[in-house]
Structure formats: structure tokens, C-alpha cells
Amino acid sequence: MKQRDFSEILSEVRAKIAAACARSGRSVDDVQILAVTKTHGAEVVEEAWRAGLSVVGENKVQEAAWKKAASVSGPEWHLIGHLQSNKVRQALELFDCIHSVDSIKLADRLEFIADEIGASPRILLEVNVSGESSKSGMKPEEASEVVRHIVENCPRLTLEGLMTMAPFSENPEDSRPHFRRLRELRDTLEREIGVGLPVLSMGMSGDYCVAVEEGSTCVRLGTVLFGDRPKIKPVRAVSDGDCAQGALDSFSGAGPTVRILD
């Protein structure tokens, strides 16, 4: 079977987003596609850029480091995975926006390092609206305190909105109550605190149409755009700097020498 052209796939995705916007009385211009390139090579970043996608999402700081260095295009880079405190400095140097701020402690760490290096990062608060123990994110009832703290104590940080991940399900409709709850939480925070939180980062390949219907302004799409993620073992570059500067694709073997980590 002939491999489908990426632009054709993207057109179908955009058409589905447009239909979801029409069903919910929204403008398609209000929804951004974030291309999730985790475990794929740097070439998919270039492919997404050429097709008109201007935002790339990565789960891991280390992977973004070599991939961004290997990319010749200029998308925005967003961190969508959990951020450890010891990775904050590197994350601030790499990413334009961090979707996964989940505590006052992490916000304070970001503020401290951002002030040191002169950064002004955009951030989203990750909220675990489903209550799943396997999910990162603060509890919904903690969000008000965190928002107030950031507004009052973190002038370097630009808080743009909220992010969540719905539990996995084969039925996209199962995600709807979780997306609705995040939107309602956002509305409550805006009303009670008097702060604008325009961004709702919610919806992935299996449920993005439902997310758009419920108010998502940023859908995080990987598999639906690029196919299944490569079946790989974790690898680490052993070249100088350990971040594969100038590498083309550490995962496919087109980059520097790598060592398999068992």
C-alpha cells in the first residue's frame, strides 16, 4: 500500500477540527494543532513545519535537546511531559511554553531560574481532572491557590491556561466529561481571580474532536499525524555533550553513536 502523503493526512485532521468547531459554534482559528513528535526523528519536525504546523510538542527535555539542535526549521517548542526540578534550567533554554506545571514548588523553581537567565516562559497548569493515580497534575481543588500564587509571586511566568489528559478509552465520548470539567474549572478561575486563561490544552489523537467541541484551544496530536511511534529501546548519545548536537536522528541511527540502555 502506498504511504499516504502527510499533507493529505493533515488536511483530513483539519477538516475534522473544522467540523467540530462548526458543531460547537466556534471559529477554527481558535484551535491550534500541536505536533507531538516524541520518539520520532528530527525529520518529522521538518515535515510538520513544511506542512504549515508551527508548534512541536515533546515529552522529554533530553529528547528535545538533540532534536531541536538537529532541526533547521523554526517551530515553537512546547514541553508537554512531566518536568523534574533538576531539568528546569535546560527546559527554560529549550522550550517556548511548558504545559506541565503542577505545583507551587515547580512554579517557584521556574520563576527563580527564569529570573537568573532572563527568560520569560509561558506556562500552563496541568490539572488531573480524572483523579487517576497514574496521571500527573494537581487536583482541581488546588488550582485556585496555585493560580493566585503565580499571579502574585511569579512575574517572570506568563500563565496562559490549563492542560489535562483524559483517561484512555476506545470511545472518545468517555473523554467529554473530563474536558468539560477542565473548561468549567477555567471559567471559575477566571471569574473568581480575575485572570485571563485563554488556553485549554486538551485532546489527543483519539479524542481531539470531542475536546474541540468542549472548548480546547490546543490539541496535542501525534499518532494521527505521524503513525505509531517507533518501537525502540531508550538510547543515550555517547558523543561529547551527550545531547547529540548536529545529530539527524539518534533513534533511527542516522545520528551520533548511541548506547542501548537496558
Tell me what each language-model feature is.
Residues 255-257:
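Short, intrinsically disordered C-terminal tails of secreted or membrane-associated proteins
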